[in-house]
Amino acid sequence: MKGREAYPDEELRRRIMDFIMAAGQALLENGAEVFRVEQTMEIMARSFHLREFHVYVLTNGIFASAGTAEISEVRNV
């Protein structure tokens, strides 16, 4: 199927999720606004074709999921 983007498999989604969470954590630790962290993480998820990405950022933590309960992560910052 030319032109169609494949949805990443579960292992790849986990690796992508770790990458996006690390980026969000780095932004938050270096003083980025909460809105900017959420927005950046959502843009990154779209660029990796994660369809069901949800993120909630506080000043001291990040909560995110990528479609399933198995691919959910919380990070304290």
Stretches with model-predicted labels:
Residues 1-77:
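Soluble N-terminal domains of membrane-associated systems
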